[in-house]
């Protein structure tokens, strides 16, 4: 519609220009000289035809450009609409716990440069890797695949909190295959990206929770790993249970009961701090959490075991 209206506006201008040139040709067609340029009638008539051809060529060029613009804009709108549709399907499958169907859907678009698709691909690959039926060899391949997707997402859009979050998660996962030195060195990178994710989106409870896990992990680091870290690094990463507790509570404040593992870790952290009353409070909540996933079931079992030992 926009292209048609532009063409309609252009045609009168072309007709007007053609008539003006023809009038000039007739007025100069007597063979006399006119003005300082001294055109002869035949020259003007010839130039008229050339000018008309030029106008036609210009019009076609203009229309070609306009057509290109309209088609390009339509393609962008269509592509955007398609991505939005895929994301809606992906989020529905994720919320429904359809891990394998989600992975099958998203891997069709693994060559995409869309950051929203890429970080979801990282998450989906990691979720498949965590399934009980996934072999150790397949798990390793999937975790490195997830890291590559997360890396591409981050390179595509450094302001995406989700890209920072999943890049940090995936680096942590592959650390199990790269030795203690690399794993400890990566801890700095992981912390940096979790902190950036929180900065970009302070309302994302998952990023805050993961920062809590980072603190908890280094608070309970075995003495031999701590010793290795001290030998390898001048300032090895470290944290405390109090700091971990702060992040777990903050995550709960942002989004109450968002994740069974956050409830479990609140209970476990209070146990580490010898506060059995508050530990029991959070462990009961973890045990009672509705089991939507395999992880939820495992957390229910662990919470029940810890409560038995109190």
UniProtKB/Swiss-Prot annotation:
InterPro entries: RMD1-3_a_helical_rpt, TPR-like_helical_dom_sf. The keyword Cytoplasm applies. The keyword Cytoplasm applies. Pfam families: RMD1-3. It is found in: Cytoplasm; Cytoplasm, Cytoskeleton, Spindle; Cytoplasm, Cytoskeleton, Spindle pole. The modification N6-succinyllysine is found at residue 165. Its main location: cytoplasm. Disulfide bonds: none annotated. Gene3D superfamilies: Tetratricopeptide repeat domain. One of its GO terms (molecular function) is microtubule binding. It comes from the Eukaryota. One of its GO terms (cellular component) is spindle microtubule. Keywords: Cytoplasm, Cytoskeleton, Microtubule, Repeat, TPR repeat. TPR repeats lie at residues 168-204, 222-258. Belongs to the RMDN family. PANTHER family: REGULATOR OF MICROTUBULE DYNAMICS PROTEIN, REGULATOR OF MICROTUBULE DYNAMICS PROTEIN 1. Interacts with microtubules. This is Regulator of microtubule dynamics protein 1. The gene is Rmdn1.
